Each structure stands twice: as C-alpha cells, then as structure tokens.
From Swiss-Prot:
It comes from Acinetobacter baylyi (strain ATCC 33305 / BD413 / ADP1). Belongs to the TRAFAC class translation factor GTPase superfamily. Classic translation factor GTPase family. IF-2 subfamily. The keyword GTP-binding applies. Transmembrane segments: none annotated. This is Translation initiation factor IF-2.
Length: 899
C-alpha cells in the first residue's frame, strides 16, 4: 500500500467516501475530508480496526470454501399435478491450517499419556491372557485326543480299502482274458457275501462303540471346563468362559452333542408324520418354542437367569414445581402417563388439556395425590443465583457519580436546560423540537461528574418517564415559569414518589416577561411539593436555559443532594445495569444503550439482557467515541446482542454461557406464556362482548419505529384511541427499517403501514409500488396520532341530523274520490315541501310518519308553500287525518363525524 487520499482509497476499495470517512473517524485517525492524505501505517490501523469491529482476527492459516449447487425437484401441488421447483444448496467449509507447535505439543502429550498408562494396563491384562492361553491349550489337547482315538479305532477298516484303492490306481496293464476254471459257482459267491456282511457288522459295531466312548469323554471334559470357567460356587454372577474361537466352538459342539436323536430331529425342523408333513397343533408349537429356546446357546441361557425384575416398591419422585407448569411436563416429571394426571385433575374439578398450564398450588395437590413429593421453587431461582454470585464477587464500594433524570411537561425546556449544561445543541436536532426517546449523557462539570437522563414530556411516553424515575438517583422537575404545573408535571411527581426518588424543582424560562414563579410555587404546593423557601424540604432553583441564569446553583443543589444520599458502588467485578434504550441499525445490528450501575463493563464480556445474551463486540460513549470499559453511572452503547431487548430490562455480565442461555430461555418462555394467556383471555373477552353485537369497524396498523421505547409509547397511544364505534388494532410492530414482509402483511390484513423515524428498504418500496400500499413516514408523534384519528373518523358512521322545515295546522278535512281524505291547512311557520318526509302530530304526539302524496294551492300542484298561506294536502297511506292535527315537514342531513 502507498500513501493516497481518502477519495482515492475509497475508489480502490469500492466504498462511499462518506462511509469511509466515518470509519476513519471511528478508528481515531485525524483525516476529516476526502482530500486528506492517509499513510500506509494509518491504512493498516484502519484495517485492524475494521477487523476488530466485525469480530474478525487475522489468520493466515484459514481458508473458507463456498459451494453452490442447483438442482430441480418435483413436488405435488394442490391441483394434483406435479410441478418442478429449483433447489439451490449452499455449502460453506472453513479449513484451518494446523499450527506445527500445537501438533508437536499434542503428540508429546499423547506419548506421555501412553507411557503412564502402559505399566498400569500390563499387570491388569496379564491374568486374563494367562487364563486365555490355558483354556486354548486344554481345548487343543482335548481335540487332539479325540482325533487320535477315532483314527486308532478306524485304522483297521480303512487300511484294506486304502490298499485296494492304491492298487487300482497303480494298475495300468491291460486286463487278461478270464480263465473258465477260475470262475466261482453261485453257492461259493453267496457264502463269501454272507461272511463279508457278518464281518462288516462286527466292524460297524466296534466303530460306533469307539465313537460313543470318545464322544462321552469329550463331553465330560467340556462339562468340567464349563463348570470351572463359567460360574463361581455361589452362582451369583456370570463370568465369560473364554474369548478364543476354539474354546467357544468346542463348548458349543459339546452342547449340541448332549441331545439325543429325537431332540436333534426337533432342532433340525421337527418330527414328521407318515405323510411327510410336520406335526401341527400345540405339540408343534411347543417343539418350535423348544427349538428357539435351545438356539440361544449356553451364554444366553445363563444370562437370562439374572435378567431385570420389576421392582416391588413404588418409586417416589421429588417434583420441582414453578409458578406455572404444563400438564405434560408435570406427568413427565412423575414418570406417568398424561391421562392419569388429567384424570386426577378432573376429579378435582379441573378440565384441562395436556398442553395447558396450571398454577403452582394445583400442581402441588396433584403431585401429593399421585403419591410424590412436591417441591415449590421460584421461576427466577437461576437469575437470583446469578445475582448473588455477582454480588459476592464485587469488591469494596466507593463514591459514584449521581444519575439525574430531567422530567416535566412537554415544551417546558427540559432538553434546552440540559443543552445549557452540556454546552451543546441537541434540542435543535430533535424532530419537532421535542424529545422522542430517553437520552443519556455523561457530563463532566467543574463541580464533578453527573449523568443526566432526558425523558420525553409527551403524554404518550408515560412508560419511558416511569423507567427514567426508577433508574435514577435524583429527579430534576422542570416547570416553565410562564405556564405552571401541567398534566405531565403532575405525572412526573407521581413517578418520582412511586420510585422514592428525591426531587429538585427547576423553574425555567425566568428570562421571560410573563414569568410568575410565585404562581408556580403555589401550584406545586397543591401537589404536596413544598419548597425550602416556604419551610418545606424540596430545593428550588430559578433558572433560564436561554441566558444561563441559575445553572451553577442547580448543579450545586444536585451535588449537595448526592452527597447527602451517600451514593456508592463497586467498580470491580461483573457489571450490572439497566437498558435505557435499544434499536436496530442496518449494518450494525442491535444497538443497546446501557446505564452501568455496578462493576465494570468491558469489551468481550458476556452480557445477559432480558431474554437476549451475547458478547460485547464494540462499545462507545454517548458521543459515538469507542471506549474499552465503563464504570458505575456511565451510559454506553454496546453491540453484540442478537436482538434488541426491552427498555428497562436488567443487564448482568455472566461468566458461564450455559447459565446465560438457561436464564434467557426461561425468560423467553415466561414471556411467551404470558402473551398466550393474555391473548386467550382477550379472545374470550372479545367473544363474550361481541355476542349479539354488530361488527365494529377496525383500523389495522403495521408500525415500525427506530427504538424500543418509542415503539412501546406509540403502541400504547394507538391502543388508547380505540372506542366503542371504531377500534385501532396494531397487527404488527417492530424496531428497524420497513421490510418486504411488512408490506406483504399490510396488504393481506388491509392495514396502514406507518414508519416512525425509519424508512423502507429498496425491496419494500418496489413491493409497495406494485401492490399499491401507501407507506407513511413520521418524525413527530403528534402527526402520527392525528393521521390515525383521521383514519378512524373515516370509519365512523355519519350522524343523522334532522331539521324542521315547516309546520302546518289542519283546519278542515275533505273527502276526495282520488285521494280519500284531503286536509285544508294553514302554514304556521317555515315552509312545506312536497318531496320531504312529514310527521302527523295529534296533541303534540306523533301518530304517523311518511310523505305527502299531493300538495296544492288553488287546485294547482305546487312544490312548496310558505308561512301564512293556505294549502290542500293529502298524506300518502294515511286516511285518519283530523282537524287540529299538525303536519310537520322535516329534512335529514348526514353529518360526517370526527374524533
């Protein structure tokens, strides 16, 4: 690499100049513009920084191979026809070159282990080898004796045959003609054959007798060998006879030869009847059973004598039960079937399924009823153990900086006051000039170090203010001198009191002419906030964020209050803190803002936050500068968690990844169980409430926000907009950019897609343009809520408003052949219209409601008659009109409603 400018380096590596400048700043290099020169050493520093950020270390002995194969497969579709789909398989293998020093060390350790274990194995293997050798020698001697006996007995009978065969094989001369004198007679031949048969019978008897004696001797020797090596005198345990194939074969042969001819027939396939068929019925079944039994051999028959026996005494288990437990899990812990547990619950009056959860008390009664011992445990036992271990590992406590939360009503100058202290301009960067989420700032003043938490003042951010009050030591209540105590001011007072946090009042905007601090103090007194000037215990500072008036006095009050509280924490051991905010950044993943409360947080620590855990890959302060560690009362941003935790979750550094995974899984299970119970309860309530009612119009919303706290506040604000006539339903909510799946969900559920401080990616924009889905972006919470209100107003049914146009009194009633009863009337007020609806009133009571059939004046049909004029009219469908009745003409208008 050579020295080059930032612009040239960006072109060579294919990165945007702005992105490269940002990475250069993160690496701590001095270059700030595209024309600045970066040296070779600085380029190496930048590369090492990027590798460290992305979790990659330099390893020359590592290579990664990626393969991609494409194939097709046929699958059945819903129409019954097979369709072909493309299947792409991607494989990735990483090969690491072994280190020669490591290989040599492993070989040396393996050799030392073998040398240590060899002297120990030789004495242990010597008796077994000696026994095996003796067994093989005895078996070989027995086999040789049996063969010698058989050869000795049959030597006489086989010698003649062998000699004849040899002579026949060695004779090759032609056969001479037979002499007639040498031909024997028939009587001589019969005598010779009879003598040969007698000799053969004697030889057969002798041979059979010799074979039986040899077999008997072999059996006796094998029985002695089996008796010697098979079992001890007690017969309690079985020992292996021998491992040699020769001894095993001899014992097996002796065992087979111990059966008589009938048993051998049974073993070969059973006796046959005269027709050649096997005997059937029960006898044949017994023979087959006998055959299969004897095929197992000597070892199997001996082993079956010591098989498993069913225990007589019932096993009693210690069953651990949490706050809730699933019926199937409870049955598994007691080692019984699920139906038995369900039966017991039915006897107790509980109708449940195997996947349903029951409470701790009910589960304990079931366990006792089944005869086991219930042990009640806490669901947070593992978490408590981790906290106790972390507390024990901490060292001596020292004084720590105070954590101060600035609270108050919207637009009362909270962020501007904090800016004055920090000497920066943050409020101008907030959308709409209001704080949208909790901001954590670590400020080093001349008076000391103070950590400030800036909370939003809008009504929708109640949960954020509550979390800010719980995580703080001191609450600074900002009240505008020209506005006084407002609803969010009173709410902040309630949050501070609920958390037991001391309050310091800062009356802001004292530079305005309309400032009236006495009125503010009077209003605070009505909220039980009595200032020290009036004999109370609440410090009050008159400040102005614009001019800087009273800022030093406010800082003095904060530090004095922190000294009185004696705030201490340990800077050693595992870190413990709380999640201030969490968001998802594209390219960086989950970014979590943490306030460290105890211990020291370092890069590489294993962090457990809510139901997420992971190692800290990178850490930065509130200004985005990378740091390596953070002590108590210091806010930081970390990377490394797989997903964004909930704001307010407790953060703990653990050493054992297995325990961290167990605690995270347990928390996730509890959250999922609570969500399922809440949804089932809501469904049941909705079913009961909707019985007999019409469908209520609903505005479906898919919501995406930049941080968790803002998402929570927006969801709560939208749910509060629901009313009896129209409801708001948040179909899906999440943190991060709007994706294609969000657009698809909005299309399928006919929902409005809203993004707060986020944008849609390229795929999502293309999908929304194709499907005609409108994506709305917001940066101010007022605008988002107003648009949802307008959408709800469009779902409201219009209001029917009646306007009385005129009233006429019936003077005479005439009978007409065409209309029946016709009334002569005098218009008293307003105007009568022929095409408008009417009411007939008798003694100011409505007796008929309809329309006019005819309206005439001097026998001419007219459209309207004004007040003070006479007219004749006929009511359509009503003939019972009488004198002194009143005819009221009215009009109905549809008025569009709004929230």
């Amino acid at each position: 690499m050579t020295d080059k400018s930032i612009k040239e380096l960006a072109l060579s590596v294919g990165r945007p100049v702005e992105k490269l400048l940002e990475q250069v700043r993160e690496a701590g290099l001095p270059q700030r513009t595209a024309n600045d020169i970066i040296t070779t050493e600085q380029q190496d520093t930048l590369v090492n920084h990027l590798k460290k950020i992305h979790g990659q270390e330099s390893g020359a002995g590592k290579i990664t191979l990626k393969r991609k194969t494409t194939s097709t497969a046929k699958v059945a579709s819903t129409s019954g026809k097979a369709k072909t789909i493309n299947v792409e398989v991607r494989k990735k293998h990483t090969f690491t070159k072994p280190n020669p020093e490591q290989i040599a060390a492993e070989a040396k350790a393996r050799q030392e282990t073998e040398e240590r274990t060899r002297p120990q194995e030789q004495p242990r293997q010597a008796p077994q080898q000696q026994m095996r050798d003796e067994s093989e020698n005895k078996a070989q001697a027995t086999l040789n004796a049996m063969r010698a006996a058989q050869q000795k007995e049959t030597a006489k009978t086989t010698s003649t045959t062998t000699e004849v065969v040899v002579k026949r094989k060695s004779t090759n001369k032609p056969i001479k003609p037979v002499n007639v004198k040498q031909v024997e007679t028939a009587e001589q031949r019969k005598a010779r054959e009879a003598e040969a048969a007698k000799l053969k019978a004697v030889e057969e008897t002798a041979r059979r007798k010799a074979a039986e004696e040899a077999q008997q001797r072999t059996l006796e020797q094998m029985r002695k060998m089996a008796s010697k090596y098979s079992t001890e005198e007690t017969g309690a345990t079985i020992r292996v006879i021998d491992d040699s194939p020769l001894a095993a074969g001899l014992v097996g042969q002796a065992y087979e030869d111990s059966f008589n001819q009938e048993d051998r027939e049974i073993k070969r396939g059973g006796a046959t009847n005269p027709r050649g068929q096997k005997k059937g019925g029960r006898n044949n079944q017994e023979e087959q059973s006998f055959k299969s039994h004897h095929k197992r051999g000597l070892k199997t028959s001996q082993a079956n004598k010591h098989g498993f026996e069913k225990p007589v005494k019932k096993q009693v288990y210690d069953v651990e039960i949490g706050s809730t437990i699933v019926v199937a899990d409870l049955a598994q812990k007691m080692a019984i079937k699920v139906r038995e547990v369900i039966k017991t619950l039915m006897k107790m009056g509980e109708l449940v399924t195997q996947n349903q959860s029951i409470d701790q008390d009910t589960a304990a009664l079931v366990v006792e009823e089944m005869g086991h011992n219930p042990i009640l445990v806490s669901d947070t036992q593992a978490e408590d153990n981790l906290l106790e271990a972390a507390e024990e590992a901490r060292g001596e406590q020292t004084t720590r900086p105070p954590v101060v939360t600035i609270m108050g009503h919207v637009d009362h100058g909270k962020t501007s006051l904090l800016d004055r202290i920090r000497r920066s301009k943050v409020a101008a960067g907030e959308a709409g000039g209001i704080t949208q989420h909790i901001g954590a700032y670590h400020v080093e003043t001349d008076k000391g170090i103070i950590t400030f938490l800036d909370t939003p003042g809008h009504a929708a951010f109640t949960a954020m203010r509550s979390r800010g009050a719980k995580a703080t030591d001191i609450v600074v209540l900002v009240v505008a001198a020209d506005d006084g105590v407002m609803p969010q001011t009173a709410e902040a007072i309630d949050h501070a009191r609920a958390a037991g946090t001391p309050i310091i009042v800062a009356i802001n905007k004292m530079d305005k002419e309309s400032a009236d601090p006495d009125r503010v103090l009077n209003e605070l007194t009505t909220k039980q906030i009595v200032p020290e000037q009036w004999g109370g215990d609440v410090p009050v500072a008159m400040v102005s964020a614009h001019s800087g008036q009273g800022i030093d006095e406010l800082l003095d009050l904060i530090l004095i209050q922190s000294e009185l509280m004696e705030l201490k924490a340990s800077g050693e051991g595992a870190a413990q803190g709380v999640v201030i905010e969490a968001r998802v950044d594209k390219g960086r993943g989950a970014v979590t803002s943490i306030l460290v409360q105890n211990g020291t947080l370092n890069i590489g620590d294993l962090v457990l936050a809510g139901s997420s855990y992971g190692r800290v890959r990178a850490m930065s302060d509130e200004n985005g500068q990378p740091i390596k560690s953070a002590g108590p009362s210091i806010p930081v941003e970390i990377l490394g968690l797989p997903d964004a935790p909930m704001a307010g979750d407790e953060v703990l550094v653990v050493n054992d990844e297995k325990k961290a995974r167990e605690v995270a899984d347990a928390r996730a299970d509890r959250e999922r169980q609570k969500r399922i119970e809440r949804q089932s309860a809501m469904r049941l309530e909705n079913i009961m409430a909707s019985m007999g009612k019409k469908d209520v119009p609903t505005v479906n919303v898919v919501l995406k926000a930049d941080v968790r706290g803002t998402l929570e506040a927006l969801t709560a604000a939208l749910n509060e907009l629901s009313m009896d006539e129209v409801r708001v339903r948040v179909i899906s909510s999440g943190v991060g950019a709007i994706t294609e799946s969000d657009v698809t969900l909005a299309e399928s559920s006919e929902a409005v897609l809203l993004g707060f401080n986020v944008r849609a990616d390229t795929t999502a924009r293309q999908k929304s343009d194709q499907d005609g889905i409108d994506i709305r972006y917001y940066s101010i919470i007022y605008e988002l809520i107003d648009d949802v209100k307008n959408a709800m107003s469009g779902k409201l049914a219009p209001e029917h408003r009646e306007t009385i146009l005129g009233v006429a009194e019936v003077r005479e009633v005439f009978h007409s052949s065409k209309f029946g009863a016709a009334a002569g009337c005098m218009v008293l007020e307003g105007m009568l219209h022929r095409n408008k609806p009417i009411r007939v009133l008798r003694d100011d009571v409505v007796v008929f409601q309809g329309e006019l059939e005819s309206l005439r004046r001097y026998k001419e049909v007219v459209e309207e008659v004004r007040a003070g004029m006479e007219c004749g009219l006929a009511v359509k469908g009503y003939k019972d009109i009488k004198a002194k009745d009143k005819i009221e003409v009215y009009d109905v208008q549809l008025i569009k409603r709004s929230l």
